């Protein structure tokens, strides 16, 4: 089933292109900085590598565009959509109500914030309190997105961050190659997403928020977490060593470097998000059903 609905992506992850493909998009949706003319009617990509829910997340890497700033950028897009529809605000609202919004945040709030005690004071907060801090901010941001006209919003949960190659290298993994304390901290955030969806749907008339349970897609990936390239242990830790050759068979590797899944991993994520293979994959429904909501 192809919905061919406009697709707005506010996120930090990269695999949602394949979700857009399943929804009937024929090409990449343009990044916000390059969006122009009527191509904005098919969707806009606001994602920024390293960004997060909290505005300070990832700042040690340089300039990143936080979720707060992405919302500001989306509001600018809405003004341009209205202009493309001859100033008709009702048509604009109708258009936005039909759009699919993908919100995938939180990973960097751990990788590029909470798990970096030398750079961010949040590391001193107990895991449950930090998770609630993220949820409180996320609730405000997603409510703003609703107030801008969004009605169909898929919220992606976090995968087992304690199993990514860089985390396993920098800490003491278990026999499966995963750092249990990290996964437990991340699960505190994931556990709050279903109640968040219930709360948002109850408080916002006409809203269709749904939760995509990414952690259910790959419950045990630690034993497979060898990266495709040799990763740096110094500056740029976790990234591929410059000029090093990647593995010849990338389709057999779930991770390209110390952090990022390969295309194979992203295709798996998109497929399960679009059509759930288990009742635990999505709540209350997968993206295919969200499209027809």
Predicted regions and their residues:
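Conserved active-site regions of diverse hydrolases
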Residues: 1-293
